[in-house]
Amino acid sequence: MAINLEDKKAIVAEVNEAAKVALSAVVVDARGVTVGAMTGLRKEAREAGVYVRVVRNTLLKRAVAGTSYEVLNDAFTGPTLIAFSNEHPGAAARLFKEFAKGQDKFEIKAASFEGKFLAANEIDVLASLPTRDEAIAKLMSVIQGATSKLARTLAAIRDQKEAAAA
């Protein structure tokens, strides 16, 4: 299906705006995925704050030009679906990693985070980044553990002094 020039410009502008505000990007080959599964993926992506779009490779190369996602240009081959994480850097990678478990033909090509190219086998690093809430919970447990250890130490010192005085 041919796209007129105005539509192409609009697509490039839309994807470029998404790329400018995104924290990370993941490129996949979604060939062979059913329409129902793709609809479900798009719904999950919206809920996770991930912008998902199927774009022609030439338009995609123009859209990411001048952004930190230019490093992905070599991955723009064949049918390409791109996802930009807007709220958490690992959101798109985590979403696609989970989705790929149930889809044989869904292939993660590459990702980019902070201007660095990540090959398909390095996606796990991005997907395993804790969310903001998870990071806060881990920090609080570390602080709580240190606080309780300090309290136990002070109590032991007090008990020793009381025993020595008695």
Curated annotation (Swiss-Prot):
Keywords: Ribonucleoprotein, Ribosomal protein, RNA-binding, rRNA-binding. GO terms for cellular component: large ribosomal subunit. SUPFAM superfamilies: Ribosomal protein L10-like. It holds the Pfam family Ribosomal_L10. One of its GO terms (molecular function) is structural constituent of ribosome. InterPro entries: Ribosomal_uL10, Ribosomal_uL10-like_sf, Ribosomal_uL10_bac, Ribosomal_uL10_bac_type, Ribosomal_uL10_CS_bac. GO terms for biological process: translation. HAMAP family: Ribosomal_uL10. Forms part of the ribosomal stalk, playing a central role in the interaction of the ribosome with GTP-bound translation factors. This is Large ribosomal subunit protein uL10. The lineage of its organism: Bacteria, Pseudomonadati, Pseudomonadota, Gammaproteobacteria, Pseudomonadales.
